Amino acid sequence: YLCDEETVHAMLRDSDLLPLDRAIVEDMGVDALNADSVASYRRQFKSRRSDHPWVGLSDEDFLLRIEALRLDGSQVRPTRAGLLMFGEAWRIASEFPYYFLDYREIMGDRDRWDDRFTSEDGTWSGNLYDFWGRVVNRLRSAVAHPFRLGADLHRIDDNPMDKAVREAVTNALVHADYFVRRGTVIIQYYDRIVLSNPGGLRLSVDEVVQGGISDTRNPTLMKMFNLIGIGEKAGSGFDVMREGSLFAGTAEPKLEVFDNPDRVQLTLYPRKFAGSAEGCMGGYSVDTAPSDTALSPENG
């Protein structure tokens, strides 16, 4: 079996002992990061961890602690994770030429999208943090919210399928290989959500589905999300999505792997429709082939 050049480069990146997202981005400074994105992230961090010693730090010291920045001799420079999380899209693309984030809504029977935004449209930062918030806000409408009361008799608006959707979006972003073509694409159809990201699985499909094992391609990015309550503990992400499907009474998530170029695709079925995927329940399917509102503590 002969691998093409792109596959060989991907294999070499994945074999590196030092996480690639922790590497310093040379020739960039702190100004490469979007100040509004950093400020929003810090508000979420403070909301979840109000007594944490990092709350009172300056922006630069805070970003050093979460490894969005690192010291390069006497200079402070962004890490790849910091640039992806908080940078402007045009600055990110100078380090990751194939960087592209794409969200679409297709509600009809045709493939024509009804709404769309991408990291390249120039109306927002185009970074991962802001993409996460924007996408999760949009996908909330895809989830049914039956009336439920908590022990305090207040309505519970968040449910296991909401958590499953957030986990799926997080996984697509932190497991992507941003050096690979075609970008990360999330499409909301009327009956399903399809999330695909560049890069192959670092575990077998069975290991992903069974859970308990984690091998994150971008662990520094994962840590940044975890610090504000986004993303589940290592190896439990598929369980969270499975629990969401069980709550909603729909088919379990469908995981597919493609190559040339390597790509992973996950399909979620967030709500029931007449004649829809709930009839497939009973086993997982496997084929081998943040505004501040969205990033609130309740959305962890």
Which residues make up each language-model segment?
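Active-site helix-to-loop segments that bind/position phosphate- or nucleotide-bearing substrates
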Residues: Y1-V169, L173-R182, Q188-I193, R202-S214, ...
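Glycine-rich/acidic phosphate-handling loop/turn and adjacent ATP-lid/helix
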Residues: I193-G229, F273-Y284
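Small/polar glycine-rich anion-binding or flexible loop at a beta-alpha turn
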Residues: L153, M241, D262-V264
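Generic beta-strand/beta-sheet core signal
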Residues: I187-Y189, S196-P198, F258, T267-Y269
